[in-house]
Amino acid sequence: LKEMIQSWRHVFKLDPDKEIDDETLDAVCLSGTDAIMVGGSTGVTYENTVNLLSRVRRYELPCVQEVSDLEAVVPGFDLYMVPMVLNTQDPTWIMGRHREGIERYGYMIPWDLVVTEGYIVLNENAAVAKLTGAETSIEASAAAAYAQIADKLMNLPIVYLEYSGVYGDMETVRTVRRSLDNARLFYGGGITSAQQASEAAAIADTIVVGNVVYDHLEQALETVKAVKD
């Protein structure tokens, strides 16, 4: 199952804390995207995650949970993606929460379904940056160094560049991509058009499209075509 991420080019990220009607969800799940990622920085609960999972499960496509809160981990996802924030001085988000989770729930964890993401958060105004105390104003060379720590020292399968809500600096994305040998580069942040999707996907291995689903559905659907064509 972990191998399936290697073929993903486009992923829609849905937030359990946001309303999405059946018609919109239908369009998203039948769009041709490679997977649905369920997760958010705030307001994620067990109940709203179960609700969203049960609705996505009607469709034939992989559904993964990005784990942000231990209390909201729900059985039944194809994979569990666990972020490890690399560019923070607060060890809580590198290892602290992870230790707590394993100590409490270790016996229940389906390790064969767990994938760790080396997160590099680069938008200072994003909720995830404020929550984790991420050092967002780093140079591209520093971001690339963090990426190499994830790739070469920690052997993480995914490096995730998170611009969360703003379209990122593609030169930084390119610098990070060049620094990687084995890890897959996920890019997320501010993709609202086919052109941006195409540009980001030409550099990153996988693009993650989120907020635009709730704001401009047609534009969101066009991002799939832009990547797939």
Task: Enumerate the language-model features and the residues they cover.
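N-terminal active-site wall of soluble small-molecule enzyme domains
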Residues: 42-56, 64-77, 168-179
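Conserved anion-binding
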Residues: 72-157
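Hydrophobic faces of well-ordered beta-strands that scaffold small-molecule active sites
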Residues: 8-14, 36-38, 63-65, 80-82, ...
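Catalytic cores of alpha/beta
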Residues: 65, 69-82, 176-209
